[in-house]
Regions:
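Short active-site segment of divalent metal-dependent hydrolases/proteases
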Residues: 15, 140-141
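Domain-level recognition of soluble alpha/beta enzyme cores
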Residues: 151-179
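Phosphate-handling substructures
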Residues: 23, 64-118
């Protein structure tokens, strides 16, 4: 079976927090090196990342190893659930995976977040590069996968690790394959 494109969707490594400038923890820095070691054999030719520090730092070791630039795309930032801290944020997030149109105060709906993430994927498919790394955040990563497989949702989000890697493969005939990759 001939696959036209392989897109590695990557959730960032362990970070010190959720804010855009949050850096990786010491464990996260170690994970970034392990991620690079894991991806070295995948012939990554192009890297695109969320502008958040934790995403960029997660892929830097691979970018250095492959001598690649890290292209920044603001559309890969995390889904904004709402504009304030909620005690029941996990319940609200779960609901947002079921009702993709629901939008909490100052946040964005899952449909809005999904659409901006999927726009990036559709643009990447048109590139000449065949093996592409996309570094993003948990909820957005799952929403991108959900676009291609409606059965994916909250339970997959809950099982995400830092880092985590999913492979999206696109065939010439338009068929797609989603695989969760295990680094260990």
């Amino acid at each position: 079976v001939f696959y036209l494109k392989k897109i590695y969707l990557i959730r960032h490594c362990e970070s010190t927090g959720q804010e855009p400038k949050a850096n990786l923890t010491n464990e996260g820095l170690k994970q970034a090196q392990e991620l690079a070691d894991f991806l070295k054999s995948k012939n990554i030719e192009y890297i695109v990342s969320s502008p958040f520090e934790r995403a960029i730092k997660s892929i830097e070791p691979l970018a250095d190893y492959n001598n690649l630039d890290i292209n920044i795309d603001d559309r890969l930032i995390e889904k904004k659930l709402c504009n304030k801290n909620l005690n029941d944020w996990m319940d609200k997030l779960k609901i947002s995976f079921e009702d993709l149109t629901i939008c909490y105060d100052g946040g964005e709906s899952s449909n809005q977040a999904m659409n901006r993430g999927v726009q990036v994927i559709h643009e990447l498919i048109k590139l000449e590069n065949n093996n592409i790394a996309v570094v993003t955040h948990g909820a957005l990563l799952i929403l991108i996968l959900k676009y291609f497989d409606r059965n994916i949702g909250f339970s997959e989000w809950k099982r995400l690790l830092n880092p985590d890697v999913y492979l999206l493969e696109f065939k010439e005939d338009g068929n797609k394959l989603i695989l969760k990759l295990f680094m260990k």
